[in-house]
């Protein structure tokens, strides 16, 4: 059960994550961090070529980890890049997906980010079932917010379509 205090810190919206006005957005990246399809490609296109140049200097990212760059041409000051698991149905997938959210939030806090937007990590071409991924996302974020109650953080789950938005809303 999610407390009312935590529920008030979480928002679900349908839209384009690259257009959100918040301190940081999370990029569901691939291991190279050099751009790709889906939200990753959209973020790279919107942020501009400077993002790719900075990402090259990061030398990739392991699954479940997170790295941070400037937001460049986005409204967001920062982009936090995390690599979700390619779904295979194992417990390791769930642990790595939870790590994506937890490590992104920890990195955001280290950089004084107080509002952060997440896409539905791993639910596109990486094949993670939406309902399962949403449960992990909401549970992990809620646990982090409870554990860091002293830190003012607003979390936005930015959904690509109406179905995803409905699934997230149902979990809150």
Give the predicted meaning of each segment.
Residues 87-172:
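Phosphate/ribose-phosphate-bearing ligand recognition and processing surfaces
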Residues 1-94, 98-110:
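Glycine-/small-residue-enriched capping loops at alpha/beta junctions
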